[in-house]
Amino acid sequence: MSLKGKKIGILIEGDYYEPEIWYYKHRFAEEDAELHFLSRMWGQTSAVMAAGFKGHEYKIPFDGYVESFEGMDDATLRSFAAIIVPAGMVSDRLRYTEDIDKLPPATEFLKRAFAEKSILKGIICHGMWLAAPAPELVRGRKVVVHNNLVGDARNMGAIYTNQDVVVDGDLVTGRTGGHCHQFARKIIDILSGVDKQK
């Protein structure tokens, strides 16, 4: 099975969960996927941003190139086969907004991805925080989240499903960063056509 020619975008910020991100870097590469780490630049260059990202568990600097999702045009967005919101504190940092009457830029980006049914959306563990400002994205959909976020998911109108990985159409959710291997496997299976759940 191969994901050659498929682009996968992973949102990234400080306090990422190192084992999860390292796993994705290697596992998706094994399937020949083109991996892109996407973030809000906060007015900085890619090199400055990447150098400033530290992991959650071991405080290890991020080792990768970071691209901006801000201002991404529709054609570029549609070129992605999947967009993943990882575990750790990534989503909490990305959901910051200077204007509390507007959606955070990262949530706006997630809304745009949800509007494109051709894009597989993956949200794992605390990644669900990024959808909290736009609960309509998951309302009425089956999801799994970290145990600490079950109340949040239910308050967003999602249908909590007690499984390690849950698929609801073009949405794949995972319980914790520790389940990243099962989560990635499901995404690979769907994108490669092995799993027809989407």
Feature-to-residue mapping (PLM):
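A short beta-strand/loop micro-motif in the catalytic core of glycosyltransferases
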Residues: K121-G122, V143
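Short, thiol/selenol-centered motifs that function as redox-active sites or metal-ligating centers
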Residues: I123-G127
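Extended, subdomain-level signal for the structured scaffold at the beginning of enzyme domains
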Residues: M1-S118, W129-R139, V150-K198
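Glycine/proline-rich loop-helix segments at beta-alpha junctions forming the active-site rim
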Residues: H146-N148
